[in-house]
């Protein structure tokens, strides 16, 4: 990702698209174009949604020398935090993601491309784990026996969201799928949420996938912290995020009681994956 500054002082974000992870670049950019153009009709704030800069051929990206590139307008007077400095920062990230959900409530989610198939299909992640355990290619499974037993004991519970989606008990929605604090831009002066960024993983799914925000933001240590005595879940941060998210997304009624399950499932899914 580059900051490009023109002679006139106009600033842009130039990004190389990760075509190794996202093989269908055209589908990915169709998703981003459709979602950002839809959001543009719902807000009067030019900083309230990312703005793609089209090529001279009116395309949303450029393919050159075996690489794919895209450009956004730079969102001026904004900041991006890696970790919340205050509870209000975390609250505002919840407002950002909740607003994103609310504004896209009537977007036809089924029309979106699945840029990473089965990304938050937790039962499928368990299937991959079981296959790997059976092969045990590095002969390390015995070293983490207790952790494996912990995960497998909760396998049925962790299928709740996917089962509810399949049964039609939860609505299919536009989901961001990477709802970390650093994917919400805040106003540099007021610290209020402006817009959601990093839209590569926007796909159809359940709003409960936003529970990944809790896994990341309510943790008392970095996700790669090796000293596990430092790692807990802050219930206060959980309350702060839930309050901001629900207030920003009053249309989120179906599955409201499953919000805590979203946080549990996304946390377990991460553990099963890695």
What is each model feature region?
Residues 10-31, 37-111:
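ATP-binding pocket architecture of kinase catalytic cores
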Residues 15-26, 75-95, 106-176, 181-195, ...:
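ATP-dependent phospho-/nucleotidyl transfer catalytic cores
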Residues 1-7:
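Conserved ATP phosphate-binding architecture of protein kinases
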Residues 11, 69, 172-174, 194-196, ...:
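Hydrophobic "anchor" residues on beta-strands that sit immediately upstream
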Residues 53-57, 113, 124, 238-242:
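Alpha-helical transmembrane segments of bacterial inner-membrane membrane proteins
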């Amino acid at each position: 990702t580059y900051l490009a500054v023109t002679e006139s002082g106009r600033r842009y974000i130039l990004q190389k698209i990760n075509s190794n992870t996202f093989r269908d670049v055209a589908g990915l950019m169709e998703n981003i174009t459709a979602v950002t153009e839809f959001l543009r009709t719902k807000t009067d704030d030019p900083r309230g949604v990312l703005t793609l800069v089209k090529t001279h051929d009116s395309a949303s990206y450029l393919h050159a020398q075996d690489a794919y590139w895209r450009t956004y307008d730079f969102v001026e007077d904004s900041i991006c935090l890696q970790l919340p400095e205050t509870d209000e920062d975390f609250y505002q990230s919840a407002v950002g993601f909740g607003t994103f959900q609310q504004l896209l409530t009537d977007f036809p989610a089924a029309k979106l491309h699945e840029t990473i198939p089965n990304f938050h299909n937790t039962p499928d992640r368990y299937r991959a784990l079981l296959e790997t355990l059976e092969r045990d290619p590095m002969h390390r499974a015995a070293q983490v026996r207790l952790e494996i037993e912990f995960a497998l004991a909760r396998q049925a519970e962790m299928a709740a969201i996917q089962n509810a989606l399949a049964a039609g008990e939860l609505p299919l929605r536009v989901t961001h799928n990477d709802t970390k604090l650093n994917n919400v831009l805040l106003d540099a002066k007021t610290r209020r949420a402006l817009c959601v960024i990093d839209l590569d993983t926007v796909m159809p799914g359940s709003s409960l996938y936003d529970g990944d925000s809790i896994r990341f933001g309510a943790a008392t240590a970095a996700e790669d912290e090796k000293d596990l005595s430092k790692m807990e879940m802050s219930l206060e941060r959980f309350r702060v995020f839930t309050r901001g998210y629900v207030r920003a997304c009053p249309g989120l009624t179906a599955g409201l009681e499953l919000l805590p399950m979203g946080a549990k499932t996304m946390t377990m899914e991460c553990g099963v994956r890695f």
